[in-house]
Structures are given as structure tokens and as C-alpha cells.
Amino acid sequence: MINKNNKIVFMGSPDFAVFILKGLVENKFNVVGVITSPDRPAGRGQKIKQSPVKKYALNNKLNLFQPKNLKDRIFINKLKNLNADLQIVVAFRMLPKILWNLPPLGTFNLHASLLPNYRGAAPINWAIINGETETGVTTFFIDDKIDTGEIIMQSKVKILPSDNAGTLHDKLMTVGQEIVLETIQKINQSAETKAQINDKELKSAPKLFKENCKIKWDNNAKQIMNQIRGLNPYPGAWTFLINNGTKIEIKILKVKLERQSHSHKIGNIITDKSSIKICILEGFINLIEFKFPGKKQMDVKSFLNGFSFDINAKMI
């Protein structure tokens, strides 16, 4: 039996974290506080936006905190007054020791990789970009470094050739909800956690910047396909389209590989009324779905209805 009497403080912000919090609430755990990021301007209109966790907390009348500074004395005192037994962190930010050291049962984090591999901000994306066939989720006790604490539990998930960052995100989210509940039980039973693993030759998952996401068409087919899959739906692999003397940025979301010998230059565009092909070393990348800045996602057929390529059109 899982002890549901523990007072739990939950910390997180995005949809991934909402699903874990939802699991705690629906399974009748005693969530005494929820900490999420402050409201921030977002999007083209810079409208103030609430985090998904905040929306869920408000809808379920949970005790909500949005500190700008995690070391703020007033906030820390409010947290102490909750007398939490355990804190759970999912997709939040680095915590100061004064925060993670508060509860008697500790503070554990759910991370979307099989630690110690893929420490960092973008483990789901990098696992696909690097061509992994397996990843998973890990729960571990937080310490003063990033994703280095004592491992509690892990669960593996296969990465299928058809997976992209979006589908893998949802798989890991589902498995993550299960492992968080199991981790609470394990901590209550005072079961031994795993020993830390040797850190040599590990793969990392650093934050994705725009330059990480630019497609290099002279890479091999596997690298290009994995990059596009690993960045779909967010933040999106991108390239420049050169056409009729203009240079337009375009996000490539879904493609199909066609292996075939050809004599065209890398990046050249081959098109007819129903397809757009980009030339690569091992054949062609067939575009299926893509997006221009400020426009909705579109398919090739819709795009070609009102667009024409010149003979020298290419992707760079």
C-alpha cells in the first residue's frame, strides 16, 4: 500500500508536469502546495501567459505559489509552514539547497532520460537527434548539481522509427506518472536506492538554441531524419529556402526519405505538382509538412496550389 498521508509539495510548469500532478491529485495524495513559474509575456502579442501547472492548480483549488526568487524569505517561510514530508519536482528549475533540503523525506525529481545519460534541459529531443532506440525516465534525489543526485527508480521506453519529440514526450509522460507513484512508495518503505553511475563518456542534453536546430543538408540521411524527428513539434528543425532571389526561413516538420542515386547538387529542390524533394547525398528528402514564420502548418499539396519554384531554388 502506498502511504497517501504524506504532505507533498509539487513543483513544475509545463504540460509534462501537469500530467504528473494530475496523477497525484486523482490518486488522492495529500498535495499541500504547488509551486510554478510566474506569469510571463509570450507569443507574438506578448500576452501574459499562465503556466499549464498554474491553470491546473487553480481549477483544482490547490494551494499555489509563484515565487520570482526561490530564496525569498517570505516564500521560504510559507513553504516551511506547510510542513511537507516530501517534495516532487518535474520540469522546473534548479533549486537552492535551502529549498530541496526542507522536507524530512527529501526532494526528488522526475527526469525524461535514463540518467546519468542526457542530463540537461532537452533530453527527449537529443535522444531522437542522436538516433537512440531506447530512453526512459528516472527519479532521483536532488542535490546541488544538475541531474546528478542519487537515483531512486528508472523505467525504459523504446523509441520507434515513427516517433518524434511529441510522441515520445507523451510516452514518457505516461510512464513518468507511474514511476512517480512507485517512487513515493519506495521512499516510504525506506528502500535502498541505486548507486550513482560512473560519469565517463556520457551523452548530454543541453538547452536547444536556434543554431542547434538548423538543418545541414550535407549530413547523412539518418542524421537529417533524426534531427527533424527530434525537433518536431517543438522547437522545429529549420532551413533557408532560396527562391526567386529571396531568402525565406522555413521549419521542416515531417518528411520521408527516398534513397536514390542522382547527379543534383546538395540542397537543390526538385518539384512537380504534388511533391517537393530536397537533394541530399543518399537521395531525396520528401517534404510532407512544414511551416513559414507567422503562418500555420501546411502540407505540400496546399502549398503548391499558390507557389512556384524557380529553376535554381534550393535549401541552405
Predicted regions and their residues:
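N-terminal Rossmann-like dinucleotide-binding module
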Residues: M1-R44
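Donor/substrate-binding cores of folate-linked one-carbon enzymes
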Residues: N6, E26-N30, S37, L86-E211
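A secondary-structure boundary/capping signal
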Residues: G12, Q66, A91, L110-H111, ...
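Short beta->alpha connector loops
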Residues: S13-F16, N69-K71, A91-M94, E258
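Amphipathic, non-transmembrane alpha-helical secondary structure
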Residues: V18, K22-E26, I76-K80, K97, ...
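N-terminal glycine-/serine-/threonine-rich beta1-alpha1-beta2 phosphate-ribose binding loop
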Residues: P41-N83
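Internal anion-binding site segments
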Residues: D199-I316
